[in-house]
Regions:
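Gly/Ala-rich beta-loop-alpha elbow adjacent to hydrolase catalytic centers
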Residues: 90, 94, 98
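Catalytic active-site module of serine/aspartate enzymes centered on a nucleophile-bearing elbow/loop
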Residues: 230-262
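Conserved HGGG/HGGXW glycine-rich cap/lid loop of the alpha/beta-hydrolase fold
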Residues: 9-60
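Conserved alpha/beta-hydrolase catalytic His-Asp/Glu region
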Residues: 123-129, 142-199
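Flexible "cap/lid" loop of the alpha/beta hydrolase fold
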Residues: 100-104, 110-141
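Active-site loop/oxyanion-hole signature of alpha/beta-hydrolase fold enzymes
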Residues: 49-89, 252
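Alpha/beta-hydrolase fold catalytic core
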Residues: 1-22, 43-47, 83-84, 110, ...
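Short beta-strand/loop motif that positions the catalytic acidic residue
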Residues: 200, 206-208, 212
Length: 262
């Protein structure tokens, strides 16, 4: 199992394929497993890296976690592996992190694809907003059926592949301890990228599912409004997980954007 020791902790990641590097970043309660099909598809032409953020999947850290920490984690990950620059693909919280990396370390990012990502934290489903409070998180972990019920509602409804998505998210969420559970979503809830977006000169693609009930899909309009070089792909039949709901089209859109000359 590939791991990397950074200043902040131990990072688990998976890599597949050959060619130019592409880095994939999962969302809240997720892990690299979200990208299992994507790294197989992109790995035909690219060297793909899918990492677990601290506190998720198999990455280890005992201290506080935050979106800000994850931005620095991606930078350190690239530095340690000798990746000079690369496109970043991020789902949900991972997309917010990807935009943060592009703003803080512009020389490292060629282009970004964000999928169902919040530009402002107020776009999160109320269940996610509440999860950012320690008291609520403690309650959820005291009564596990609360977490299971919330995951069921958020994943089963909205997308076409709700059953498969629920199984994947429930398995990943089972590995997450209370601290990263509420700390990461708490900092995501307070996110506001409106001031940073106009500074980004790289190509940005926002993929949003029309049936998303986890992050308001109208965030795509904010992206287009504030990012000078952004474009949007609208997935009519998808919820929060277009890579599950409309897999073939998703991979086609991602590949086309990656291959387009900047």
């Amino acid at each position: 199992v590939p791991t990397l020791v950074t200043d902040q902790g131990i990072v688990h990641y998976e890599t597949y394929g050959r060619g130019r590097p592409v880095i994939l970043l999962h969302g809240w309660l997720g892990s690299w497993a979200l990208w299992r099909n994507t790294i197989e598809e992109l790995g035909k032409d690219y060297k793909t890296y899918a990492l677990d953020f601290f506190g998720f999947g198999d990455s280890v850290r005992s201290q506080q976690v935050s979106v800000d920490l994850y931005i620095d984690l991606v930078y350190q990950f690239m530095e340690k592996l000798g990746i000079v620059k690369a496109p970043l693909i991020g789902h949900s919280m991972g997309g917010t992190v990807a935009l943060g990396v592009a703003a803080r370390y512009p020389s490292k990012v060629v282009k970004t694809i964000i999928i169902g990502s919040p530009i402002v934290g107020s776009s999160l489903n109320p269940i996610l907003k509440l999860s950012g409070y320690q008291r609520i998180a403690n309650l959820v972990y005291t009564f596990p059926f609360l977490k299971d019920s919330a995951i069921y509602v958020l994943t089963r409804f909205g997308g076409r592949e709700g059953a498969a998505t629920y199984r994947m998210v429930a398995e990943d969420a089972g590995k997450v301890a209370p601290q990263p559970f509420f700390q990461s979503i708490g900092t995501l809830r307070n996110t506001n990228l409106v001031e940073k977006l106009p500074l980004l000169q790289i190509p940005i693609l926002g993929i949003y599912g029309k049936r998303d009930i986890i992050v308001d899909p109208r965030q795509g309009k904010l992206l287009l409004q504030y990012a000078p070089s952004a474009q949007q792909a609208w997935f009519e039949g998808s919820g929060h997980f277009p890579m599950m709901d409309e897999r073939e089209r998703f991979h086609g859109v991602v590949r086309e954007f990656l291959e387009k000359r900047s």
